Amino acid sequence: MAATRQLRTLQSQPENKVCVDCAQKNPQWASVSYGIFMCLECSGKHRGLGVHISFVRSVTMDSWSAIQIKKMEAGGNERLNKFFAQYGIAKETDIISKYNSNAASVYRDRIQALAEGRPWNDPPVVKEANKKPPLAQGGYGNNNNNNNGGWDSWDNDDSYKSDMRRNQSANDFRASGNREGAHVKSKSSEDIYTRSQLEASAAGKESFFARRMAENESKPEGLPPSQGGKYVGFGSSSAPPPRNNQQDDVFSVVSQGFGRLSLVAASAAQSAASVVQTGTKEFTSKVKEGGYDHKVSETVNVVANKTTEIGHRTWGIMKGVMAMATQKVEEFTKEGSTSWNQQSENEGNGYYQNFGNGNKAANSSVGGGRPQSSSTSGHYNNSQNSNSWDSWGENENKKTEAVAPKGSSASNDDDGWTGWDDHDAKDDGFDGHYQSAGDKKSAGHNGKSDTAWTGGGFL
């Protein structure tokens, strides 16, 4: 913005409100090499001269550096025209001849030195001869001439060299064909420069571009050329593109992902810690202010005492329950084993009684029986017939108390059979039955039966 304001200030000066090479007003282009302002048409001609002769910039559309602003301040349209007038060059002189003159070269050096702050002394003035370009040959009546530069001699090299020059426009060709002897400003000729001058200009161009390339190498690459950066683009070799290594890309992406994840985790942990610390401080301050810390400690002590007391009571209750459970398990185990033994003995006694009845019937049919045996048998049958579902519990108890002899001898084993004769009068049937069984066994031993009874059955 500061550069634009300075340019506007310079442009608002009276001598800079008109183009330096023509009468066009309000010029919007400038030549940094001379510090002058020009119109659009003349700026195109200046661009054709080359940047080493005239470096053209737009006042509004281009960016300007500090050194360029200083060159514009050191120059000016009126100063340039006065300087050229000392060398005999008028304002209406052709742009090509004007700015390729020795006076233009001296003025460029003068502007460069003043912008850089170096002292400058103008050299002695040597007026230059104003050489007019040769007039065009031929017209409508002389179109067949080989030297007229018309379309009939388009393949003639000599005519082409004499008429076709750089910066020669279509208007120049029309002027040369329409008006014989007319003066064309923008048309150059071989008579303007000698061979030695052209060779010197070529050598100067090579040195100029070499110097420009050396200066460009020393400039930074991060800035645009308008701000003093390095020229990189058309006409120069750019840096080779870096090789794309997929493995490096993957590792870089993974490392960046882990790095970002670690940063997020660290920030989250820091935020959580700060929040917890703030909440803890607030809670502690409120507790201390309200006197809740003493109440909380008392409550904790009471809860601890109650918990200990309840624990002791619970442990005592659990010990009592475990002792009761152990006692009950032992009682149930003993009762189960006793009932199993009694059931086995009842089954054995029942089988013995039935088998005894069968043997009694057989003995009575073979050798005759005693009246007591028959009465006992009848009594047993009566007792069996009287066995019903109404008295099944009483009969079961009676069977449990009944005992059978273990051997054929008259002596009985008292182990486990004590109190077997302590029965009521209603159990006489079982006593008779036992006596019958003893008589049968003795008869068997005396007679034909050799069966012996053991605790497990017959042998």
Curated annotation (Swiss-Prot):
Residues where Phosphoserine is found: S169, S188
GO molecular function: GTPase activator activity; zinc ion binding
Domain Arf-GAP: 4-120
GO terms for biological process, alphabetical: vesicle-mediated transport
InterPro entries: ARF_GAP_AGD6/7 (IPR044519), ARFGAP/RecO (IPR037278), ArfGAP_dom (IPR001164), ArfGAP_dom_sf (IPR038508)
Gene Ontology cellular-component terms listed: cytosol
Zn finger spans (C4-type): 19-42
Sorted UniProt keywords: GTPase activation, Metal-binding, Phosphoprotein, Zinc, Zinc-finger
Region ranges (Disordered): 118-195, 214-248, 333-459
Role played: GTPase-activating protein (GAP) for ADP ribosylation factor (ARF).
Gene: AGD6
Protein name: Probable ADP-ribosylation factor GTPase-activating protein AGD6
Superkingdom of origin organism: Eukaryota
Biased composition (Polar residues): 335-344, 360-380
Skewed-composition ranges (Basic and acidic residues): 180-193, 420-431
Annotated Gene3D superfamilies: Arf GTPase activating protein
Annotated disulfide bonds: none
Residue spans of biased composition, Low complexity class: 142-153, 345-359, 381-392
